[in-house]
């Protein structure tokens, strides 16, 4: 999702933009150490193809067809989210299957600031949208701390 949000630029995943001290009230204080973004490479893709991929990510959450598998991500979202959902079935010893549901996303859709990936391993209820809720809640929480509108 981050590569799509960055128009094909692959960056190393990171959790924080910096390390901060606390202020007198226990809130966010001064920046102690900034974590730089490390660019890995650029994917060789045309602008037209990248635009199609971005439109696909947007439609997964915001479209109205029967293929709009991530519509519940938008319910209660504070900003526009683009995402791709997925399901992977694996088999462990003895032939027992395990189903993992996944969401990769970025927000806001038009000016991405955050990319989020959620994996829900061994999901026994494929009608569950818990990975969608987790995705939306992470993005909403980030937006509360770092307004993206």
Which residues does each PLM region occupy?
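Active-site beta-strand/loop architecture of penicillin-binding DD-peptidases
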Residues: 1-39, 57, 61-149
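A structural-propensity feature for long, helix-poor, extended segments
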Residues: 39, 47-48
